[in-house]
C-alpha cells in the first residue's frame, strides 16, 4: 500500500452513513441491509464522530446518552493501540444529552462496535451550527486518531481481540 500499511488477514471497509442526527437512520438502514452478511468472519466497526480536539480523543464504552454498551474488546483494542503509540486517548462515553454516534446503531444491530470522538462534551460553538465546516477541522486531532486506527487494525490483523 502507498502508506506502508500492510494487512495480511484483514479486509478494511468504509461505511459512510448519514442522518445520525435524525435517529441514526443511516446506520440503522445499513445494518438492516447487511444483516448476517459478516457472521462468518471476525468483524468490528469503529464509528468516528467529531474528531476535532486531540485533547478530547476518546473511546466511548457507552453510547446513545449512555444507554447502549459498546463492544468492550473493540473499545479496549483502540485504547491499547493509543497507549502503544503514546497518543492520549481517554475511556469515555456519550453522556446524557450528548446524543449518539452511529456506533449505537451498529451495537444495537449486533455488530461489534465502538465509537471514537474527539470533542469536548461541553459543546463548542462549532458543534451542529453553521460553523461546523470542513475548514474547522483539526489536523493534529485527525492525525492522532488515524494513527491509532491503523495501529488497532495492525493489532487485529495479528489476532488481537478476535
Residue spans for each PLM region:
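Active-site-adjacent substrate-binding region
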Residues: 51-162
